[in-house]
Design a protein with these regions (language model features):
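C-terminal segment of N-terminal export signals and the immediately downstream linker at the start
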Residues: 30-58
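N-terminal secretory signal peptides
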Residues: 1-10, 19, 23, 27-28
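Serine/threonine-enriched low-complexity regions used as flexible
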Residues: 63-66, 134-159
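Low-complexity, intrinsically disordered segments enriched in Ser/Thr together with acidic residues
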Residues: 114-141
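Ser/Thr/Pro/Gly-rich, low-complexity intrinsically disordered stalk/linker tracts of secreted
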Residues: 9, 21, 75, 141-146
Length: 163
């Protein structure tokens, strides 16, 4: 067994040498921008066509995104359509529409774009997506769009609807 001595404190020369090598690196990293922030896309118009029916559910048909007034493209994962249905009612959804992903968390169904929505172009969205369930007459649902900078028009559906 050896009697190893604990390492001695570094010498002044070792500390100064290390500092002289690290100073330029620290200066360079301090002068670099911390992040290159891209401006968030704003504008565009989303028309949500569809309807709702007690005992059946909510459906979308012929919905459209118009990027004519958008500041740029909405990249994947930037657009969400969030539908909240009454709690306690079992429901199912159709398969994810082309260009979108569907997730369900409790009574909230979220559709998120998986492909970019280009600026300056019309793009059909949501296909014939539906949420089916035996929702009682008089119960309510909500449909929200994120980001809120997209102008949203509802045709046959309502942002705050009643079955």
């Amino acid at each position: 067994m050896s009697n190893a001595q604990p390492p001695a404190d570094p010498s002044r020369r070792t500390v100064l040498t290390a500092l002289s090598w690290s100073a330029p690196v620290l200066a360079l990293s301090a002068s670099a921008p911390t992040a290159v922030a891209s401006a968030a896309t704003t504008g565009g118009a989303l028309t949500l066509n569809g309807g709702s029916s007690a005992g059946e559910g909510i459906f979308f048909a012929g919905s459209n995104y118009d990027g004519a007034t958008a500041s740029g493209p909405y990249t994947a994962q930037q657009l969400q359509v969030i539908v909240t249905v009454p709690t306690g009612v079992p429901f199912t959804t159709s398969a994810a529409p082309a260009g979108f992903d569907v997730s369900v968390d409790g009574n909230v169904v979220t559709l998120t774009n998986t492909t970019p929505l280009p600026a300056g172009e019309q793009t059909p969205v949501l296909g014939d997506f539906f949420i089916s369930g035996s929702f009682a007459v008089g119960t309510s649902y909500t449909v929200r769009v994120a980001p809120t900078t997209i102008t949203t028009t509802f045709t046959g559906l309502a942002a705050d609807g009643t079955f």
